[in-house]
Amino acid sequence: MALLQISEPGMAPAPHQRRLAVGIDLGTTNSLVAAVRNSVPEVLPDEAGRVLLPSVVRYLEKGGRRIGHEAKEQAATDPRNTIVSVKRFMGRGKAEVEGAANAPYEFVDAPGMVQIRTIDGVKSPVEVSAEILATLRYRAEDSLGDELVGAVITVPAYFDDAQRQATKDAARLAGLNVLRLLNEPTAAAIAYGLDNAAEGLYAVYDLGGGTFDLSILKLTKGVFEVLAAGGDSALGGDDFDHALFGHVLAQAGIDAKTLAPEDVRLLLDRVRVLKETLSSAPEAALDVTLSSGAHLVQTISHDTFASLVEPLVQRTLTPTRKALRDAQVTPADIKGVVLVGGATRMPVIRDAVAKYFGQPPLVNLDPDQVVALGAAIQADLLAGNRGTGDDWLLLDVIPLSLGVETMGGLVEKIIPRNSTIPIARAQEFTTFKDGQTAMAIHVVQGERELVADCRSLARFELRGIPPMTAGAARIRVTYQVDADGLLSVFAREQLSGVEASVVVKPSYGLADDDIAKMLEDSFKTAEIDMRARALREAQVEAERMLEATQAALAADGELLEADERAQVDTLAAALRAVAQGDDTNAIEAATKALADGTDEFAARRMDKSIKRALSGRRLDEI
């Protein structure tokens, strides 16, 4: 009888039976799909030989739609029903995109993520992205000749939980099994590292259509370790287009608010061509007629364009400096700078990067394709197609600290920023009041000391805590971040075993706490934050002391003489008078005075408790 053959879990059963998996770069402007063939990653073209799929979806009446090149060609004539740059809307609420520069859409006020009204009904960014992902899936299956087991989809390193979850939802709608969400800079490093057998410290400068990421990676003997990540989730090539768009209108004396939607789209398309032309020419000409009959003829020089976008270029260098500082390295320590994203083709970007790092950036891989290639390599490995030379390890990080709210609106950090993922960390907390039977767990993200200055991610409650005196219960709170960067939180009361948990899927309608700005604020206000934290801690301790004293007096006040009781009341009143003020030293001094003034009272209460416990018991029972 033939023996049954059992392959290693997750591995292809035989070398020739490869499991088909792809890497997808879901971009703001263009999207790509890549796969590993004959041990080499390659971008998969469509039937016309084009590898870039414009991230554009046009909706028609009665459920029809056009995706990619055909939709892009019709964007100027039907702007309200043609959705472009939808990645900028992923995981965002209506309040965050209502003022999106020059967007011709009708945004719908719906719960959660922003919705866009089209001729085919209201659509969410998840649905629009799913159309793009489905098109890439069909392309891959046609090219590879079979169904896919899954895909690695890349996201900006600074995408928050809402944006990552929205991306996974879009993939699910498109019929894709997500093997991993991979940060775009890390994907680029994989492509470069494996292709060139690189080792050392590398910076990945990723300027896409709608986001900017900067990651510092250490490549050593097959280990890809992300040391630090920085970025701006609201800065990309689109912003360079809008800067040029505004300049053209200003030169023509036209107010953008007076333009028809089709003129906005037409002019944006033309200035994008201008921008691309200026990447290889000293000047470029614009000649366009608007629907109003206005005829715009202008010539833009490269120097003019460079001065227009200089503030945007500098915005990319701010998180770059922070990432280097977090990684504790200098520009001179960086062995190479990898450029990612079509926007990095602009000479102003390459010149700025070369000047800052003191070396020309690496450009031997196509910046439009490098992310998809890296994702394909990771997908092939996760699908179980391990071959020789595939013994490498990916260590990614979280961009911002994760913490929990404690009494007084303070933040206790559980997982600090730039921690390698996947990761799990736990910390014990206790109750604040006697008889407390429930605890509210408020999960926050950010670097500041106060909850009000951080981003709220989720809230849940742990109920059923056995009634005990304040401080007796032990609640263990565990934070767990998976390889996709998604967070789960668990709380368990150690004595009773009651527990509660939440998978953090924050509201898609969160206000825009720009992550880069959050980090910048944390550096600028560190001293102020620490003073505020010290004040709140003093106030919380004062409140705890006052409540404990009040409870003790109510229970055992007869243990004090009249003059002793008056002294305790005086000390308590003095503490109460300063407890809500802003003088930390005064609060701490008054708290200490009350603690010292009640020491004798506490000793008498202890004696009373011991006598009560021993009453009526024999010595041999003790």
Swiss-Prot record:
Protein family according to the UniProt entry: Belongs to the heat shock protein 70 family.
Molecular function in Gene Ontology: ATP binding; ATP hydrolysis activity; ATP-dependent protein folding chaperone; unfolded protein binding
Keywords, in A-Z order: ATP-binding, Chaperone, Nucleotide-binding
Organism this protein belongs to: Burkholderia orbicola (strain MC0-3)
Lineage of the organism: Bacteria, Pseudomonadati, Pseudomonadota, Betaproteobacteria, Burkholderiales
The keyword DNA repair is annotated on this UniProt entry: no
Biological process (GO), any one: iron-sulfur cluster assembly
Cystine residue pairs: none
Record-given protein name: Chaperone protein HscA homolog
NCBIfam families hit by this protein: HscA, PRK05183.1
